Regions:
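PLP-dependent amino-acid enzyme catalytic core
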Residues: 2-398
Length: 398
């Protein structure tokens, strides 16, 4: 593996054992815990000036803070997504400024591309022939595209309710797909069954938190936000959350940026979930250290219908360590918030609307101040969820 000189190894979040990245493709071999990358901040030697002079955009711009060198990265030009001001929404919330980090501008229209780039790089370097994952839809399209870049096969296990565009483009990129009757947990069961088959021993899992590299890639979102704000740390970042990759990635980013001396503070990291599939919110409200399975998920926001998040405990840590909150939003409020952002010319998705609706709740409850700078993450292109947005307008008679 062509790793950066700053990468020390992979550390288990549970037992704290350290492992060699070249010998550890998935979870901790000692206890099965989630792995994260550990870095030598001195070896990275990253400064604001060195980043300003970087010869790459996107993920490769931050390669000294990542596991793989810029030249070895499987990339389709992910990252470098716009940070768009939303002054009308800021005025409604009564805060200093609102920005939307528009992840729909990534190559396959989803923030998943950040983590997929690193995870497929690792799979290639581990000698995999095929990558596989369960997904609500968008990450399957992403995996198919990046696997094609690396000349690997891919297979996505998706529920029947997955969006047409995600399923279609998974096939267009050359990926295999198993459409599983039922909902997301049924797709997970089918994936796990396939992974346990001896005939699939050469498959490499890209399931959330199975590989350390999807949450590693996710941290670059906050790297970019900080640089785009000229290193002024925002007061709040709101992450629509399924498994927790985004908020966990931002938590890793805050720690690493402070260790590197690039910033002194961290933003409050907030989790936003649909109120009828909100296991992180429920666990936070109860003061629990981990999530419990949400028994009856029921939301129009299919990308976030994840009743048993793989990163639930880590998402709770991210919220609590940074002084954030976990907030549920109704489907109607989420769709209305997405439409309002679209009225400002920001092509927000229904998934992004969950974060915007949660920000309204945070402001109403006094958790956002009049001078605060708030970043809303729009994880998916609005065009990928146009059907549910249009249906919302039709119900209103528009």
């Amino acid at each position: 593996m062509d790793t950066t000189t700053s990468l020390d190894g992979l550390v288990c979040a549970d037992c704290e054992a350290t492992h060699d990245p070249a010998a550890t493709p998935r979870r901790c071999p000692d206890c099965g815990g989630v792995l994260r990358a550990s870095y030598d901040a001195a070896a990275a030697a990253v400064t604001r000036e060195s980043l300003a002079g970087a010869r790459f955009d996107g993920l490769a711009r931050f390669s000294d803070l990542l596991p793989f060198t810029a030249d070895s990265l499987v990339t389709a030009g992910e990252g470098a997504t716009p940070l768009v001001p939303a002054p009308e929404f800021a005025a409604e919330l009564g805060v200093g400024a609102v920005y939307v980090k528009d992840e729909g501008a990534n190559p396959t229209g989803t923030t998943a591309d950040r983590g997929t780039a690193l995870a497929v790089t690792a799979a290639r370097d581990h000698g995999a022939e095929k990558v596989a994952l369960p997904t609500t839809g968008d990450a399957g399209q992403s995996a198919a595209a990046y696997a094609a870049r690396a000349d690997l096969d891919s297979e996505a296990f998706v529920p029947t309710r997955s969006t047409f565009v995600a399923k279609a483009m998974t096939n267009v990129h050359g990926g295999d797909m198993s459409v599983v009757e039922g909902r997301y947990p049924d797709a997970v069961d089918a994936f796990e069954g396939a992974m346990s088959d001896d005939d699939n021993a050469d498959w490499h899992s890209l399931a959330p938190f199975d590989t350390p590299y999807r949450h590693e890639g996710a941290k670059t979102l906050l790297f970019e936000v900080l640089e785009q704000l000229d290193w002024a740390v925002p007061d709040a970042v709101v992450h629509p959350t399924g498994h927790g990759l985004g908020v966990v990635g931002s938590h890793l980013a805050t720690d690493q940026m402070q260790e590197a001396g690039l910033v002194d503070d961290a933003p409050a990291l907030h989790v936003a979930q649909p109120e009828h599939c909100a296991p992180v919110v429920a666990a936070d409200d109860a003061g629990d250290d981990n999530t419990e399975v949400w028994e009856r998920p029921d939301t129009l926001i299919g990308a976030l219908e994840v009743p048993d998040p793989a990163g639930g405990a880590l998402a709770l840590d991210a919220v609590r360590d940074t002084g954030g909150w976990a907030v549920g939003a109704s489907d109607d409020d989420a769709l209305e918030a997405a439409v309002q952002l679209n009225a400002e010319g920001i092509e927000a998705s229904a998934t992004g609307g969950v974060g915007a609706a949660a920000a309204r709740e945070l402001a109403a409850d006094g958790h956002l101040g009049s001078d605060d700078t708030v970043v809303l993450v729009n994880p998916v292109a609005g065009t990928k969820e146009n059907d549910v947005l249009r249906s919302h307008l039709m119900r209103k008679g528009v």
